[in-house]
């Protein structure tokens, strides 16, 4: 059986997108792992699956698999690609699209300038909701990593994030600390790890070690989580411009209980077919 797919990226964070509205297949974690291999497969950070909604209040269901086969709750860069995909494939004519994810409902807005806005919903900061093991909620936590205390913020954007402030983004220990914090026992569902350098009150640089994918060119939910951490701790003010290795995202957040708004591009790379 051959399945049509589209290769897309959001700031270099790359995706294989499958339409399972007009095609029918049962996708398993082993398929994501096989196709995600950059040497023997298609190669991607995440596999995005477009499905018909199970909820009448939304337009589509959105599922996400990392290249290691793990299914995750949310992907911000993927959400922008999702919006571009369903419009390009004429699965909808709407430019404001409501999508059901494992992490909750998000709202997508395809703008006339080609940029795509995503209402990511309100961040969750209660430790049990992230999930993160801590006796009480705080702006910052200290985590022991190989006997060394590491200060970080913990935020859920529908998926778990740890945010560390660094003085130099170029020398940040992304590949050393990233996997250790990702698998830290205080994050029982594992965690995405962001390394944030604040430039001024409205600009920052970010690198992200993604759970199940390693360092990626960009991470939309990571940028949202970093913005929440930076604004909460008084380092920065909304709106923010966050530069990632793959490009820039605009993030707005009005404070606790309010949704995080992310704006950025989505690009189609090529169309293909893969055998299931």
Swiss-Prot record:
Keywords carried by this UniProt record: Amino-acid biosynthesis, Cytoplasm, Isomerase, Lysine biosynthesis
Enzyme Commission no: 5.1.1.7
Active site: 75 (proton donor), 219 (proton acceptor)
Catalytic reaction equation(s): (2S,6S)-2,6-diaminopimelate = meso-2,6-diaminopimelate
Location in or out of the cell: Cytoplasm
Binding site for substrate: 13, 46, 66, 76-77, 159, 192, 210-211, 220-221
Database matches in Pfam families: DAP_epimerase
Main subcellular location of this protein, as a coarse class: cytoplasm
Site (Could be important to modulate the pK values of the two catalytic cysteine residues): 161, 210
A GO term from the CC aspect: cytosol
InterPro entries found in the cross-reference section: DAP_epimerase_AS, DAP_epimerase_DapF
Pathways per UniProt: Amino-acid biosynthesis; L-lysine biosynthesis via DAP pathway; DL-2,6-diaminopimelate from LL-2,6-diaminopimelate: step 1/1
Database matches in PROSITE patterns: DAP_EPIMERASE
UniProt entry tagged with the keyword Cytoplasm: yes
Biological processes per GO annotation: lysine biosynthetic process via diaminopimelate
Molecular function terms from GO: diaminopimelate epimerase activity
Keyword Amino-acid biosynthesis carried by entry: yes
Domain of life: Bacteria
Feature type site, description Important for dimerization: 270
Subunit record text: Homodimer.
Family membership: Belongs to the diaminopimelate epimerase family.
Protein function: Catalyzes the stereoinversion of LL-2,6-diaminopimelate (L,L-DAP) to meso-diaminopimelate (meso-DAP), a precursor of L-lysine and an essential component of the bacterial peptidoglycan.
HAMAP family per record: DAP_epimerase
Name under which the protein is recorded: Diaminopimelate epimerase
Lineage: Bacteria, Pseudomonadati, Pseudomonadota, Gammaproteobacteria, Pseudomonadales
């Amino acid at each position: 059986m051959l399945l049509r797919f589209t290769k897309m990226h959001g700031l270099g964070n790359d995706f294989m997108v499958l339409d399972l509205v007009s095609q029918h297949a049962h996708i398993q974690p082993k398929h994501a792992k096989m196709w995600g291999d950059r040497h023997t497969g298609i190669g991607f950070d995440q596999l995005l699956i477009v499905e018909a909604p199970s909820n009448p209040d939304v337009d589509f269901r959105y599922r996400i698999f990392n290249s290691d086969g793990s299914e995750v709750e949310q992907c911000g860069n993927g959400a922008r690609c999702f919006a571009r995909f369903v419009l390009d494939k004429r699965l909808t004519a709407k430019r404001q699209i409501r999508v059901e994810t494992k992490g909750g409902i998000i709202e997508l807005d395809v703008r006339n300038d080609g940029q795509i806005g995503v209402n990511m919903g309100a961040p969750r900061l209660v430790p049990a909701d992230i999930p993160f093991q801590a006796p009480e909620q705080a702006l910052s936590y200290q985590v022991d990593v190989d006997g060394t205390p590491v200060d970080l913020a913990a935020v859920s954007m529908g998926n778990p994030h740890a945010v560390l402030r660094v003085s130099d983004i170029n020398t940040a220990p992304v590949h050393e600390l990233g996997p250790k914090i990702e698998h830290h026992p205080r994050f029982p569902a594992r965690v995405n790890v962001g390394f944030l350098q604040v430039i001024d009150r409205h600009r920052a640089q970010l690198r992200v070690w993604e759970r199940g994918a390693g360092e990626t060119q960009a991470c939309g939910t990571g940028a949202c989580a970093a913005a929440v951490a930076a604004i909460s701790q008084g380092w920065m003010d909304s709106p923010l411009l966050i530069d990632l290795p793959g490009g820039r995202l605009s993030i707005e957040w009005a404070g606790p209980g309010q949704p995080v708004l992310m704006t950025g591009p989505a690009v189609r790379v090529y169309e293909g077919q893969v055998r299931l």
